[in-house]
Amino acid sequence: MILIDGKSLSKDLKERLATQVQEYKHHTAITPKLVAIIVGNDPASKTYVASKEKACAQVGIDSQVITLPEHTTESELLELIDQLNNDSSVHAILVQLPLPAHINKNNVIYSIKPEKDVDGFHPTNVGRLQLRDKKCLESCTPKGIMTMLREYGIKTEGAYAVVVGASNVVGKPVSQLLLNAKATVTTCHRFTTDLKSHTTKADILIVAVGKPNFITADMVKEGAVVIDVGINHVDGKIVGDVDFAAVKDKVAAITPVPGGVGPMTITELLYNTFQCAQELNR
């Protein structure tokens, strides 16, 4: 069994990116810049953004965090985003979710200039993903999953891939990326009947449902590759959506939780920020 070590791979990829960013800055005198916006005082959001700030510094990308009070209105937030859209020194914009209930998430996502939409959530980038447009900014977690498969030499062409979970953030975009990579793809969701009949056929099984130890050994094919996107807190520990202990001896490769997909998400955010800077300054 191969352990797909996202933490180690992420470190290698950041070292590669740091070299690219340094060369880019030397040749263009432009420093890629990411601006992250937090609305309110959610501790998890602050932790996530702090880790993104730290990662930016590691590769030579500038970052700025703007923290707005909980009572910030939607129009005030949209006005700030408009200013950042028109600021040529800002290449990538991230609005940390969740937002307070009085702010419409979609209105905020749609207001970000597609070329600065570092999370890849804007409808333009969703459409570009479908069309395999090279200018597409791919959603960070799905992009990280595909990078893991590629870097570990896991063949997608002709493979049967099953994605459990159909969210706009992970399930749908990773299904499309797998399809673009010439896999045959089935996307399962809460209305899927007889889930096990699908998962036991999967050469590549990707799970993103937010339910601890949801996928058990009897639901996985011998020799499959399993990517666990879940992050769940159980008895003070972080566990995935896959019963790792039961499944690991049955599969060819599997990601751990923590230390699997999570680190790759932040690394791909850095790569997307660099892509934004390059595209905006062509």
From Swiss-Prot:
It comes from the Bacteria. Transmembrane segments: none annotated. GO terms for cellular component: cytosol. Its EC number is 1.5.1.5, 3.5.4.9. One of its GO terms (biological process) is tetrahydrofolate interconversion. SUPFAM superfamilies: Aminoacid dehydrogenase-like, N-terminal domain, NAD(P)-binding Rossmann-fold domains. NADP(+) binds at residues 165-167, 231. The keyword Glycoprotein does not apply. Keywords: Amino-acid biosynthesis, Histidine biosynthesis, Hydrolase, Methionine biosynthesis, Multifunctional enzyme, NADP, One-carbon metabolism, Oxidoreductase, Purine biosynthesis. One of its GO terms (molecular function) is methylenetetrahydrofolate dehydrogenase (NADP+) activity. It catalyses: (6R)-5,10-methylene-5,6,7,8-tetrahydrofolate + NADP(+) = (6R)-5,10-methenyltetrahydrofolate + NADPH; (6R)-5,10-methenyltetrahydrofolate + H2O = (6R)-10-formyltetrahydrofolate + H(+). Pathway: One-carbon metabolism; tetrahydrofolate interconversion. PROSITE patterns: THF_DHG_CYH_1, THF_DHG_CYH_2. Pfam families: THF_DHG_CYH, THF_DHG_CYH_C. Belongs to the tetrahydrofolate dehydrogenase/cyclohydrolase family. Homodimer. Catalyzes the oxidation of 5,10-methylenetetrahydrofolate to 5,10-methenyltetrahydrofolate and then the hydrolysis of 5,10-methenyltetrahydrofolate to 10-formyltetrahydrofolate. This is Bifunctional protein FolD. It comes from Francisella tularensis subsp. tularensis (strain SCHU S4 / Schu 4).
